[in-house]
Amino acid sequence: AGENKDSNLITSFAKDVKIHKEGVFLKTPASPHIGKKLERLDYKAFDIALPESKNLLIETAGGLFTPLDDKHCMLDYISLNIKPCILLASYYLGCINHILLSIEALKQRQIPLLALVMSGKKDEDIDDFVFKYSGVKIVHLEHFNKENFRQKALALRRDLINVAKF
């Protein structure tokens, strides 16, 4: 939410990337159901259309249980528009719990999980436990900047192709 959009950052790093317009754009830095209310926007979660594209990366606002409107969360929307998922997480106290809950929620809805991308400085202990417990393959995305973005993006692409068998 807000004017500092991830898509603006990515576009500034990689000019050749196609960024689709948001299905809904909220300015309020809050959960979408709160932003919707504060901005007096009227939309229903299931009316948000996905763009037609051969390759499409969809970034949701927040986690799987982030409310999208007053009745539905991101997981409901993903369940309606089932696409293979890549789960993104970072290393922090409590991340194992959040990751495993997300993996279980995706399994329960029969949403294919291609890989878990862990962002930040690698923590082998966390990776080992998550992999042993869930069986989900893990790839890493180190922090990047404008100078090393293309190198990091290509490394992530290579690793995802290797584990997810695109």
Predicted segment positions?
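Short, structured coil segments at secondary-structure junctions
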Residues: 14, 81, 133-137
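Inter-motif core of Ras-like GTPase G domains
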Residues: 69-92
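N-terminal phosphate/diphosphate-binding loop that engages ATP/GTP or pyrophosphate donors
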Residues: 1-41
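Structural motif
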Residues: 57-59, 86-88, 117
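C-terminal lobe/tail of nucleotide-utilizing enzymes
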Residues: 104-166
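Phosphate-binding/switch loop-helix module in NTP-utilizing enzymes
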Residues: 31-68, 75-79
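Short glycine/serine/threonine-rich phosphate/pyrophosphate-binding segments
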Residues: 66-69, 95-98
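Histidine-anchored nucleotide/phosphate-binding helix
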Residues: 75-79, 97-107
